[in-house]
A protein has these predicted regions:
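Membrane-interface helix-loop junctions and terminal tails of multi-pass membrane proteins
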Residues: 1-255
Length: 255
């Protein structure tokens, strides 16, 4: 979620800024490809960290979905109230987000974990085009890998209709309401992140603010849209439908 300890610039820092300036001044296909290759050579650790970050987030999402909502779960049977379970899930995912943001890897990569956030910083000129492309690709790949791992870990439990790989789906009020709700919560999150991370007094708390919002959104807004705000996270949960044979094989426990 950018460099949570200082500014909205990604923690790729000065060499990234130089790459951005060079790319902007000579935006030919060949120069862009050269910048992409150079970025891959210099910043591949950060790309892997972004992939691992969203992968771990998806593992956490699938795990807590199984624990809280699977019909055979002791927790679900002990806590029949869906709002209470959703609140517990929100707290769990908020803490997951905070942990990832303030982890050593999160501090180094900037913990974007979300293509929307990466593209926002790209639009603001705070991340180079080649790095933005690689971050987004890594986030999608990491999210899918996290869901695949969850399928192997939980087997058929993660395919239950109450879990569905922790998919974020529109609620009973329809797609229009879900779209509007996602727009509102995304706007609020970005407003908080940009303002807090640009404040010398609040910058170090930006990750906490983001985690608290995630917890509140899951608790209160999830019935409307499923609470995603993250296209890579949504794609990861829906990808089993696109790669059914692959996920079918990984979701079967060894005999």
């Amino acid at each position: 979620m950018t460099d949570m300890q200082s500014t909205t610039k990604s923690s790729l820092t000065e060499d990234q800024a130089h790459t951005y300036e060079a790319t902007s001044s000579a935006a030919t296909p060949r120069s862009w490809l050269h910048s992409l290759i150079a970025a891959q050579t210099q910043h591949w650790p950060e790309y892997l960290m972004e992939a691992a970050g969203l992968g771990l987030f998806m593992i956490s999402a699938c795990t807590f979905a199984v624990i809280l909502d699977h019909p055979a779960s002791f927790v679900r049977n002990a806590i029949p109230n869906s709002f209470v379970r959703r609140t517990l899930g929100g707290i769990a995912m908020g803490l997951t987000a905070i942990g990832l943001i303030y982890s050593p890897w999160g501090k180094r990569s900037g913990a974007h974990l979300n293509p929307s956030l990466t593209l926002t910083f790209f639009r603001l000129g705070k991340i180079a085009p080649a790095d933005a492309f690689s971050y987004v690709f890594s986030q999608f790949a990491g999210g899918v890998a996290g869901v695949m791992f969850s399928a192997a870990l939980w087997g058929g439990a993660v395919t239950d209709q109450n879990i569905r790989y922790a998919a974020t789906l529109p609620g009973l009020r329809g797609v229009g309401v879900a779209f509007a709700a996602e727009a509102v919560i995304s706007f609020l999150l970005m407003t908080v992140v940009l303002n807090a991370s640009n404040s010398a007094r609040l910058a170090s708390l930006t990750g906490v603010f983001a985690g608290v919002l995630v917890a509140l959104y899951i608790s209160l807004e999830a019935p409307l849209s499923g609470m995603s705000m993250n296209p890579a996270r949504t794609f990861a949960s829906l990808s089993p439908g696109k790669f059914g044979m692959l996920f079918g094989s990984t979701s079967q426990r060894p005999l």
